[in-house]
Protein backbone atom coordinates (compact mmCIF):
# COMPACT_ATOMS: atom_id res chain seq x y z
CA UNK A 1 0.00 0.00 0.00
CA UNK A 2 1.40 3.44 -0.94
CA UNK A 3 2.55 5.56 2.01
CA UNK A 4 -0.18 8.19 1.54
CA UNK A 5 -2.99 5.63 1.47
CA UNK A 6 -1.48 3.77 4.44
CA UNK A 7 -1.40 7.00 6.44
CA UNK A 8 -5.05 7.67 5.60
CA UNK A 9 -5.93 4.11 6.59
CA UNK A 10 -4.24 4.53 9.98
CA UNK A 11 -6.11 7.79 10.57
CA UNK A 12 -9.40 6.20 9.53
CA UNK A 13 -8.82 3.25 11.86
CA UNK A 14 -8.08 5.68 14.69
CA UNK A 15 -11.35 7.54 14.02
CA UNK A 16 -13.36 4.29 14.15
CA UNK A 17 -11.55 3.22 17.33
CA UNK A 18 -12.03 6.56 19.06
CA UNK A 19 -15.70 6.64 18.09
CA UNK A 20 -16.20 3.22 19.66
CA UNK A 21 -14.48 4.42 22.82
CA UNK A 22 -16.25 7.78 22.99
CA UNK A 23 -19.71 6.70 21.83
CA UNK A 24 -19.73 2.94 22.27
CA UNK A 25 -23.07 3.27 24.04
CA UNK A 26 -24.62 4.35 20.73
CA UNK A 27 -23.49 1.13 19.04
CA UNK A 28 -24.61 -1.02 21.97
CA UNK A 29 -27.98 0.75 22.27
CA UNK A 30 -28.70 0.51 18.54
CA UNK A 31 -27.13 -2.80 17.48
CA UNK A 32 -26.72 -4.70 20.73
CA UNK A 33 -23.80 -5.91 22.83
CA UNK A 34 -22.85 -8.82 20.58
CA UNK A 35 -22.05 -6.64 17.57
CA UNK A 36 -20.21 -4.10 19.73
CA UNK A 37 -18.06 -6.81 21.31
CA UNK A 38 -17.35 -8.32 17.91
CA UNK A 39 -16.20 -4.95 16.59
CA UNK A 40 -13.98 -4.56 19.64
CA UNK A 41 -12.29 -7.91 19.05
CA UNK A 42 -11.74 -7.12 15.36
CA UNK A 43 -10.20 -3.70 16.02
CA UNK A 44 -8.00 -5.16 18.77
CA UNK A 45 -6.73 -7.84 16.39
CA UNK A 46 -5.92 -5.19 13.78
CA UNK A 47 -4.00 -3.10 16.29
CA UNK A 48 -2.05 -6.12 17.50
CA UNK A 49 -0.84 -6.59 13.92
CA UNK A 50 -0.11 -2.85 13.63
CA UNK A 51 1.92 -2.86 16.86
CA UNK A 52 3.91 -5.93 15.79
CA UNK A 53 4.75 -4.27 12.47
CA UNK A 54 5.81 -1.10 14.31
CA UNK A 55 7.71 -2.86 17.11
CA UNK A 56 10.97 -1.26 15.97
CA UNK A 57 9.55 2.05 17.24
CA UNK A 58 9.27 0.73 20.79
CA UNK A 59 12.15 1.67 23.09
CA UNK A 60 12.29 0.91 26.80
CA UNK A 61 13.05 4.54 27.63
CA UNK A 62 9.89 5.66 25.83
CA UNK A 63 7.61 3.50 28.00
CA UNK A 64 6.01 5.37 30.94
CA UNK A 65 7.06 3.12 33.83
CA UNK A 66 4.31 3.89 36.33
CA UNK A 67 1.55 3.68 33.75
CA UNK A 68 2.87 0.30 32.62
CA UNK A 69 3.16 -0.78 36.25
CA UNK A 70 -0.45 0.23 36.94
CA UNK A 71 -1.73 -1.68 33.90
CA UNK A 72 0.28 -4.81 34.72
CA UNK A 73 -0.73 -4.60 38.38
CA UNK A 74 -4.39 -4.48 37.33
CA UNK A 75 -3.89 -7.59 35.19
CA UNK A 76 -1.98 -9.34 37.98
CA UNK A 77 -4.82 -8.63 40.43
CA UNK A 78 -6.66 -11.62 38.96
CA UNK A 79 -4.38 -13.80 41.12
CA UNK A 80 -5.66 -12.38 44.44
CA UNK A 81 -9.05 -11.07 43.33
CA UNK A 82 -12.20 -11.67 45.35
CA UNK A 83 -13.74 -13.11 42.17
CA UNK A 84 -11.02 -14.10 39.66
CA UNK A 85 -13.55 -15.00 36.95
CA UNK A 86 -15.27 -11.61 37.08
CA UNK A 87 -11.96 -9.79 37.32
CA UNK A 88 -10.81 -11.60 34.17
CA UNK A 89 -14.09 -10.66 32.49
CA UNK A 90 -13.60 -6.93 33.15
CA UNK A 91 -9.89 -7.06 32.36
CA UNK A 92 -10.56 -7.99 28.74
CA UNK A 93 -12.02 -4.59 27.71
CA UNK A 94 -9.28 -2.88 29.74
CA UNK A 95 -6.66 -4.77 27.74
CA UNK A 96 -8.48 -4.01 24.48
CA UNK A 97 -8.48 -0.27 25.22
CA UNK A 98 -4.82 -0.39 26.24
CA UNK A 99 -3.85 -2.11 22.98
CA UNK A 100 -5.83 0.42 20.95
CA UNK A 101 -4.22 3.33 22.80
CA UNK A 102 -0.72 1.94 22.30
CA UNK A 103 -1.42 1.34 18.61
CA UNK A 104 -2.65 4.89 18.04
CA UNK A 105 0.22 6.48 19.98
CA UNK A 106 2.84 4.33 18.28
CA UNK A 107 1.79 4.69 14.66
CA UNK A 108 -0.17 7.93 14.26
CA UNK A 109 1.79 11.19 13.78
CA UNK A 110 0.78 13.95 16.21
CA UNK A 111 -0.98 16.15 13.64
CA UNK A 112 -2.88 13.12 12.34
CA UNK A 113 -3.95 12.29 15.90
CA UNK A 114 -5.32 15.80 16.42
CA UNK A 115 -7.14 15.50 13.09
CA UNK A 116 -8.57 12.07 14.00
CA UNK A 117 -9.62 13.30 17.44
CA UNK A 118 -11.34 16.35 15.96
CA UNK A 119 -13.13 14.29 13.30
CA UNK A 120 -14.37 11.79 15.89
CA UNK A 121 -15.65 14.46 18.24
CA UNK A 122 -17.47 16.25 15.41
CA UNK A 123 -19.24 13.01 14.56
CA UNK A 124 -20.17 12.40 18.21
CA UNK A 125 -21.48 15.93 18.83
CA UNK A 126 -23.34 16.16 15.52
CA UNK A 127 -24.89 12.72 15.98
CA UNK A 128 -25.88 13.58 19.56
CA UNK A 129 -27.57 16.88 18.72
CA UNK A 130 -29.34 15.44 15.66
CA UNK A 131 -30.41 12.39 17.68
CA UNK A 132 -31.94 14.54 20.42
CA UNK A 133 -33.64 16.71 17.79
CA UNK A 134 -35.06 13.62 16.06
CA UNK A 135 -36.42 12.27 19.35
CA UNK A 136 -38.06 15.59 20.26
CA UNK A 137 -39.54 16.30 16.81
CA UNK A 138 -40.53 12.86 15.52
CA UNK A 139 -40.79 10.58 18.57
CA UNK A 140 -42.10 12.92 21.23
CA UNK A 141 -41.22 10.76 24.22
CA UNK A 142 -38.25 9.14 25.93
CA UNK A 143 -36.72 6.10 24.22
CA UNK A 144 -34.75 3.11 25.50
CA UNK A 145 -31.88 1.03 24.07
CA UNK A 146 -32.79 -2.09 22.09
CA UNK A 147 -31.53 -4.34 24.89
CA UNK A 148 -33.91 -2.89 27.53
CA UNK A 149 -37.17 -4.83 27.97
CA UNK A 150 -39.81 -2.14 28.37
CA UNK A 151 -42.67 -4.67 28.51
CA UNK A 152 -41.70 -5.94 31.96
CA UNK A 153 -43.14 -2.93 33.77
CA UNK A 154 -41.83 0.52 34.64
CA UNK A 155 -38.17 0.94 33.73
CA UNK A 156 -36.10 3.50 35.72
CA UNK A 157 -35.41 6.72 33.82
CA UNK A 158 -31.66 6.23 34.19
CA UNK A 159 -31.86 3.50 31.52
CA UNK A 160 -33.38 5.87 28.96
CA UNK A 161 -31.23 6.49 25.91
CA UNK A 162 -32.84 9.89 25.38
CA UNK A 163 -35.19 11.63 27.81
CA UNK A 164 -36.72 13.92 25.17
CA UNK A 165 -35.66 17.08 27.00
CA UNK A 166 -34.01 19.05 24.19
CA UNK A 167 -36.79 21.64 23.88
CA UNK A 168 -36.86 21.98 27.66
CA UNK A 169 -33.22 23.02 27.69
CA UNK A 170 -31.88 19.64 28.81
CA UNK A 171 -30.29 17.79 30.31
CA UNK A 172 -29.61 15.90 27.09
CA UNK A 173 -27.64 12.65 26.86
CA UNK A 174 -26.95 12.37 23.13
CA UNK A 175 -26.00 9.13 21.45
CA UNK A 176 -23.64 8.31 24.33
CA UNK A 177 -26.65 7.94 26.65
CA UNK A 178 -25.05 9.80 29.56
CA UNK A 179 -25.07 13.54 30.08
CA UNK A 180 -21.84 13.63 32.10
CA UNK A 181 -19.97 11.69 29.44
CA UNK A 182 -21.47 13.77 26.62
CA UNK A 183 -20.56 16.97 28.43
CA UNK A 184 -17.02 15.76 29.00
CA UNK A 185 -16.59 14.87 25.33
CA UNK A 186 -17.80 18.38 24.52
CA UNK A 187 -15.10 19.77 26.84
CA UNK A 188 -12.44 17.75 24.99
CA UNK A 189 -14.00 18.90 21.71
CA UNK A 190 -13.73 22.51 22.86
CA UNK A 191 -10.01 21.99 23.43
CA UNK A 192 -9.41 20.27 20.09
CA UNK A 193 -11.54 22.64 18.00
CA UNK A 194 -9.89 25.71 19.56
CA UNK A 195 -6.43 24.31 18.85
CA UNK A 196 -7.35 23.51 15.25
CA UNK A 197 -8.71 27.02 14.82
CA UNK A 198 -5.55 28.54 16.29
CA UNK A 199 -3.39 26.34 14.03
CA UNK A 200 -5.50 27.36 11.02
CA UNK A 201 -6.02 23.73 10.05
CA UNK A 202 -9.76 24.37 9.67
CA UNK A 203 -11.67 27.22 8.05
CA UNK A 204 -12.23 30.05 10.49
CA UNK A 205 -16.03 30.12 10.21
CA UNK A 206 -16.23 26.32 10.28
CA UNK A 207 -14.05 26.15 13.38
CA UNK A 208 -16.04 28.86 15.14
CA UNK A 209 -19.32 27.03 14.48
CA UNK A 210 -17.98 23.83 16.01
CA UNK A 211 -16.65 25.64 19.06
CA UNK A 212 -20.12 27.12 19.50
CA UNK A 213 -21.75 23.69 19.15
CA UNK A 214 -19.37 22.25 21.76
CA UNK A 215 -20.28 25.03 24.21
CA UNK A 216 -23.98 24.54 23.44
CA UNK A 217 -23.66 20.83 24.15
CA UNK A 218 -21.96 21.48 27.50
CA UNK A 219 -24.79 23.84 28.43
CA UNK A 220 -27.51 21.40 27.38
CA UNK A 221 -26.03 18.56 29.42
CA UNK A 222 -26.27 20.68 32.58
CA UNK A 223 -23.35 18.74 34.00
CA UNK A 224 -21.70 20.55 36.91
CA UNK A 225 -18.68 18.25 36.69
CA UNK A 226 -18.03 19.21 33.08
CA UNK A 227 -18.57 22.91 33.68
CA UNK A 228 -15.93 22.73 36.42
CA UNK A 229 -13.63 20.80 34.06
CA UNK A 230 -14.10 23.47 31.39
CA UNK A 231 -13.31 26.21 33.92
CA UNK A 232 -10.14 24.35 34.96
CA UNK A 233 -9.09 24.05 31.32
CA UNK A 234 -9.69 27.77 30.74
CA UNK A 235 -7.68 28.70 33.85
CA UNK A 236 -4.73 26.50 32.86
CA UNK A 237 -4.83 27.87 29.30
CA UNK A 238 -4.58 31.42 30.66
CA UNK A 239 -1.69 30.39 32.92
CA UNK A 240 0.21 28.78 30.03
CA UNK A 241 -0.23 31.84 27.82
CA UNK A 242 1.03 33.99 30.68
CA UNK A 243 4.03 31.68 31.10
CA UNK A 244 4.81 31.88 27.40
CA UNK A 245 4.86 35.67 27.58
CA UNK A 246 7.51 35.66 30.32
CA UNK A 247 11.17 34.67 29.80
CA UNK A 248 12.03 31.31 31.34
CA UNK A 249 14.36 32.97 33.88
CA UNK A 250 11.59 35.24 35.21
CA UNK A 251 8.73 32.79 35.71
CA UNK A 252 8.96 32.39 39.49
CA UNK A 253 6.44 35.21 40.22
CA UNK A 254 3.97 33.56 37.84
CA UNK A 255 4.28 30.26 39.72
CA UNK A 256 3.86 32.00 43.08
CA UNK A 257 0.78 33.83 41.82
CA UNK A 258 -0.70 30.57 40.52
CA UNK A 259 -0.08 28.84 43.87
CA UNK A 260 -1.73 31.74 45.72
CA UNK A 261 -4.78 31.58 43.45
CA UNK A 262 -5.12 27.81 43.95
CA UNK A 263 -4.93 28.22 47.74
CA UNK A 264 -7.47 31.05 47.67
CA UNK A 265 -9.88 29.02 45.52
CA UNK A 266 -9.49 26.01 47.83
CA UNK A 267 -10.38 28.14 50.86
CA UNK A 268 -13.30 29.69 48.97
CA UNK A 269 -14.70 26.29 48.02
CA UNK A 270 -14.34 25.11 51.61
CA UNK A 271 -16.05 28.16 53.10
CA UNK A 272 -18.77 28.67 50.49
CA UNK A 273 -19.41 25.06 49.48
CA UNK A 274 -23.15 25.25 50.18
CA UNK A 275 -23.60 28.35 48.03
CA UNK A 276 -21.50 26.88 45.22
CA UNK A 277 -23.52 23.65 45.26
CA UNK A 278 -26.73 25.67 45.15
CA UNK A 279 -25.54 27.44 41.99
CA UNK A 280 -25.22 24.05 40.29
CA UNK A 281 -28.50 22.82 41.74
CA UNK A 282 -26.79 20.21 43.89
CA UNK A 283 -27.54 19.17 47.45
CA UNK A 284 -25.00 18.49 50.17
CA UNK A 285 -24.95 14.81 49.14
CA UNK A 286 -23.74 15.70 45.61
CA UNK A 287 -26.58 13.79 43.93
CA UNK A 288 -26.04 10.77 46.14
CA UNK A 289 -22.28 10.62 45.59
CA UNK A 290 -21.37 11.03 49.26
CA UNK A 291 -23.34 7.90 50.16
CA UNK A 292 -21.62 5.97 47.36
CA UNK A 293 -18.20 7.21 48.48
CA UNK A 294 -18.90 6.14 52.06
CA UNK A 295 -19.93 2.65 50.94
CA UNK A 296 -16.90 2.26 48.67
CA UNK A 297 -14.56 3.51 51.41
CA UNK A 298 -15.97 0.99 53.88
CA UNK A 299 -15.38 -1.85 51.42
CA UNK A 300 -11.89 -0.62 50.49
CA UNK A 301 -10.88 -0.56 54.15
CA UNK A 302 -11.40 -4.33 54.30
CA UNK A 303 -8.61 -4.89 51.74
CA UNK A 304 -6.68 -1.60 51.83
CA UNK A 305 -3.28 -2.59 50.40
CA UNK A 306 -3.96 -4.68 47.28
CA UNK A 307 -7.73 -4.29 46.92
CA UNK A 308 -10.46 -6.65 45.81
CA UNK A 309 -9.13 -7.10 42.29
CA UNK A 310 -9.87 -5.22 39.09
CA UNK A 311 -13.59 -4.68 38.43
CA UNK A 312 -14.18 -1.69 36.16
CA UNK A 313 -17.03 -1.34 35.60
CA UNK A 314 -18.48 -3.31 38.51
CA UNK A 315 -20.40 -6.40 37.48
CA UNK A 316 -24.09 -6.09 38.49
CA UNK A 317 -24.49 -9.72 39.61
CA UNK A 318 -21.61 -9.97 42.08
CA UNK A 319 -21.96 -9.38 45.81
CA UNK A 320 -21.10 -7.00 47.44
CA UNK A 321 -20.55 -4.74 44.41
CA UNK A 322 -24.10 -5.02 43.11
CA UNK A 323 -25.46 -3.13 46.13
CA UNK A 324 -22.65 -0.64 46.72
CA UNK A 325 -24.22 2.21 44.77
CA UNK A 326 -28.00 2.06 44.79
CA UNK A 327 -30.08 5.18 44.22
CA UNK A 328 -33.83 5.23 43.59
CA UNK A 329 -33.72 1.50 42.98
CA UNK A 330 -30.99 1.79 40.34
CA UNK A 331 -27.68 -0.05 40.79
CA UNK A 332 -24.74 2.07 39.63
CA UNK A 333 -21.53 0.36 38.57
CA UNK A 334 -18.85 2.87 39.52
CA UNK A 335 -17.71 4.84 42.57
CA UNK A 336 -18.10 8.24 40.87
CA UNK A 337 -14.53 8.93 41.98
CA UNK A 338 -11.67 7.18 40.23
CA UNK A 339 -9.34 7.35 43.22
CA UNK A 340 -11.81 5.62 45.53
CA UNK A 341 -12.61 3.14 42.77
CA UNK A 342 -8.95 2.26 42.26
CA UNK A 343 -8.36 2.07 46.03
CA UNK A 344 -11.18 -0.44 46.38
CA UNK A 345 -10.00 -2.52 43.43
CA UNK A 346 -6.20 -2.26 43.56
CA UNK A 347 -5.56 -0.89 47.04
CA UNK A 348 -3.01 1.69 48.07
CA UNK A 349 -0.53 0.23 45.60
CA UNK A 350 -2.85 0.93 42.66
CA UNK A 351 -3.71 4.44 43.85
CA UNK A 352 -0.05 5.38 44.29
CA UNK A 353 0.89 3.96 40.88
CA UNK A 354 -1.94 5.79 39.11
CA UNK A 355 -1.22 9.04 40.97
CA UNK A 356 2.46 8.96 40.00
CA UNK A 357 1.57 8.08 36.40
CA UNK A 358 -0.86 10.99 36.16
CA UNK A 359 1.60 13.38 37.83
CA UNK A 360 4.27 12.33 35.32
CA UNK A 361 1.85 12.93 32.44
CA UNK A 362 0.82 16.31 33.88
CA UNK A 363 4.37 17.52 34.49
CA UNK A 364 5.72 16.42 31.10
CA UNK A 365 2.71 17.95 29.37
CA UNK A 366 3.20 21.17 31.32
CA UNK A 367 6.76 21.72 30.15
CA UNK A 368 5.90 20.76 26.56
CA UNK A 369 3.20 23.45 26.69
CA UNK A 370 5.20 26.30 28.24
CA UNK A 371 8.62 25.80 26.61
CA UNK A 372 9.59 26.61 23.05
CA UNK A 373 10.13 23.60 20.76
CA UNK A 374 13.80 22.67 20.96
CA UNK A 375 15.76 19.58 19.93
CA UNK A 376 19.02 21.32 18.93
CA UNK A 377 20.75 24.63 19.68
CA UNK A 378 17.94 26.71 18.20
CA UNK A 379 15.81 28.02 21.08
CA UNK A 380 13.90 30.65 19.12
CA UNK A 381 11.27 28.50 17.45
CA UNK A 382 7.72 29.84 17.85
CA UNK A 383 5.21 28.35 20.26
CA UNK A 384 2.42 26.20 18.86
CA UNK A 385 -1.19 25.76 19.94
CA UNK A 386 -0.93 22.02 19.30
CA UNK A 387 1.54 21.54 22.15
CA UNK A 388 -1.23 22.55 24.56
CA UNK A 389 -3.37 19.50 23.81
CA UNK A 390 -1.73 16.95 26.18
CA UNK A 391 -1.81 19.37 29.11
CA UNK A 392 -5.39 20.58 28.65
CA UNK A 393 -6.82 17.10 28.09
CA UNK A 394 -4.95 15.85 31.16
CA UNK A 395 -6.33 18.72 33.26
CA UNK A 396 -9.85 17.90 32.07
CA UNK A 397 -9.38 14.21 32.91
CA UNK A 398 -8.10 15.02 36.39
CA UNK A 399 -10.92 17.47 37.06
CA UNK A 400 -13.45 14.81 36.09
CA UNK A 401 -11.71 12.09 38.10
CA UNK A 402 -13.09 13.31 41.43
CA UNK A 403 -16.71 12.87 40.33
CA UNK A 404 -16.49 10.05 37.76
CA UNK A 405 -14.43 6.88 37.25
CA UNK A 406 -13.97 7.37 33.50
CA UNK A 407 -10.21 7.88 33.84
CA UNK A 408 -9.50 4.13 33.92
CA UNK A 409 -12.12 2.87 31.46
CA UNK A 410 -12.90 3.34 27.76
CA UNK A 411 -12.29 6.87 26.45
CA UNK A 412 -10.55 8.15 29.58
CA UNK A 413 -8.03 5.33 29.75
CA UNK A 414 -7.41 5.45 26.00
CA UNK A 415 -6.53 9.16 26.21
CA UNK A 416 -4.26 8.54 29.21
CA UNK A 417 -2.38 5.79 27.35
CA UNK A 418 -2.05 7.78 24.11
CA UNK A 419 -0.88 10.98 25.80
CA UNK A 420 1.45 9.24 28.27
CA UNK A 421 3.26 7.40 25.49
CA UNK A 422 3.43 10.50 23.30
CA UNK A 423 4.87 12.92 25.88
CA UNK A 424 7.64 10.44 26.69
CA UNK A 425 9.17 11.53 23.37
CA UNK A 426 8.42 15.29 23.24
CA UNK A 427 9.90 15.69 19.76
CA UNK A 428 6.98 13.65 18.39
CA UNK A 429 4.88 16.69 19.26
CA UNK A 430 7.30 19.59 18.84
CA UNK A 431 8.80 18.50 15.51
CA UNK A 432 5.36 17.80 14.09
CA UNK A 433 4.21 21.32 14.92
CA UNK A 434 7.12 23.30 13.48
Where are the model-predicted features located?
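Transmembrane signal-anchor hairpin modules in multi-pass inner-membrane enzymes, especially those
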Residues: 1-76, 112, 426-434
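Transmembrane alpha-helical segments and their membrane-water interfaces
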Residues: 82-138
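Membrane-interfacial entry segments at the cytosolic side of transmembrane helices
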Residues: 111-121, 202-208, 245-260
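Alpha-helical transmembrane segments of multi-pass inner-membrane proteins
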Residues: 118-241
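A membrane-periplasm/extracellular boundary helix in multi-pass inner-membrane enzymes
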Residues: 130, 134-139, 237-284, 298-302, ...
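Long extracytoplasmic/lumenal interhelical loops at the membrane interface
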Residues: 275-294, 298, 306-346, 365-373
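Hydrophobic transmembrane alpha-helices and their immediate junctions
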Residues: 346-395, 432-433
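Transmembrane alpha-helices of multi-pass inner-membrane enzymes
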Residues: 390-434
Amino acid sequence: MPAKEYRKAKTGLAVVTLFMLFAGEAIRNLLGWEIFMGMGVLITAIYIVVIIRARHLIHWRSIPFWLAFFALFAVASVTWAYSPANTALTLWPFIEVTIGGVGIALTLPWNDFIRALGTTLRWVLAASLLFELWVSVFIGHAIYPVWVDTTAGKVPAVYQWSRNLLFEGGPIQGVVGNRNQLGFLAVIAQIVFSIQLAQKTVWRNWGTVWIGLALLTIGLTRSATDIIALAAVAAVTALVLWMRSVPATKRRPVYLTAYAVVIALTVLVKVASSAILAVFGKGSDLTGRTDIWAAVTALAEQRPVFGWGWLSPWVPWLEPFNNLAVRSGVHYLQAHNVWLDVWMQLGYVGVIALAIAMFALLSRSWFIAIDRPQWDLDDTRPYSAGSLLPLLVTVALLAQSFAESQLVVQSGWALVVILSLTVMVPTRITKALT
